Amino acid sequence: METRIRAAQLKGRGGAFPKLGRRAGPAEPDYESEVYEAAAGDAVAVAPAPAAAVEPAELDFGAGEGHHLQHISDREMPEDLALESNPSDHPRASTIFLSKSQTDVREKRKSNHLNHVSPGQLTKKYSSCSTIFLDDSTVSQPNLRTTIKCVTLAIYYHIKNRDANRSLDIFDERSHPLTREKVPEEYFKHDPEHKFIYRFVRTLFSAAQLTAECAIVTLVYLERLLTYAEIDICPTNWKRIVLGAILLASKVWDDQAVWNVDYCQILKDITVEDMNEMERHFLELLQFNINVPASVYAKYYFDLRSLADDNNLNFLFAPLSKERAQNLEAISRLCEDKYKDLCRAAMRRSLSADNFIGIQRSNAILS
């Protein structure tokens, strides 16, 4: 995974990615009727606060001899953006969305306890000695529908539990609308519900034929943008921030990514020039750091599963069949053989004592 994403860095330095190929044109769903469905009836009002503009950071590529461009890994990060404290860069730092969701989770549990609310019929299936229940989502092949639900729920908690209303003009939908129809000012005073965020993201992923892995990388870029640019995602900017993160993630993850003009066919009223400008600003605010280590990706995947469990978004479980058990065993054996080959190669380079006995490992048996 890291190899593909590092290779994609070379494509992103100019703010626009050269295309390696182009897939068939996306479908054109009736999108406009869904995106701006009013949420005033059920949404919670939020007091508007003046937006504080944040100037994009100056980029210094350190031109040296022969106009050598400094690699992203060689540049020093600012002290306030230390990797150890940034969850989108460091695998040990806690994800922002999970910490923002804990307040609501604790309040919900406390309310259920005080009101003696019964959890009702258990829907989650547990394994026993005779039956093993597994879902169809793995870290390498997540379930698309469930992953989009989890990612949009994480975005929902980002908006609901934001610290302020700091934003940038390039992401402000009032300055750069996604539709020609005039959106009432009241629309921007209410937090969007989870179902509206899900509908917006699902429409883009369905029309552009994006994968579940792309959704996870989208969330990584979104949190990285909020941290680097020191802004908040709020009712006035969430659509353009999410759109920019999806646009960038699709180009990094997929060699035959959707073109900017294809997104214009999905959103219809947005121009290619606006998409290009937003992409350029997004990359500059990320300081062109589009690298997503495998450890960071895995952390976001498992934290999304924890978020789903806390909010009763259960994955679809099914009994382990004999055919799937054989497939899992074959995959495990292949990985084990590769690991043994690496160990042997390392031992050949490092052994200096005679009669060295390697570590014995027991074989796992699936029955």
From Swiss-Prot:
Keywords: Cell membrane, Cyclin, Differentiation, Membrane, Neurogenesis, Phosphoprotein, Spermatogenesis, Wnt signaling pathway. Residues 186-291 form the Cyclin N-terminal domain. Highly expressed in the testis. Largely restricted to germ cells in the testis. One of its GO terms (cellular component) is plasma membrane. Pfam families: Cyclin_N. GO terms for molecular function: protein kinase binding. InterPro entries: Cyclin-like_dom (IPR013763), Cyclin-like_sf (IPR036915), Cyclin_N (IPR006671), Cyclin_Y (IPR012399). Disruption phenotype: Deficient male mice are sterile, due to severe sperm structural and motility defects. CCNY and CCNYL1 double mutant mice undergo embryonic lethality beginning at embryonic day 14.5. At embryonic day 13.5, embryo display substantial neurogenesis defects including a thinner cerebral cortex and a reduced number of basal progenitors and postmitotic neurons. Belongs to the cyclin family. Cyclin Y subfamily. Key regulator of Wnt signaling implicated in various biological processes including male fertility, embryonic neurogenesis and cortex development. Activates the cyclin-dependent kinase CDK16, and promotes sperm maturation. Interacts with CDK16; this interaction mutually increases the stability of CDK16 and CCNYL1 and increases the kinase activity of CDK16. This is Cyclin-Y-like protein 1.
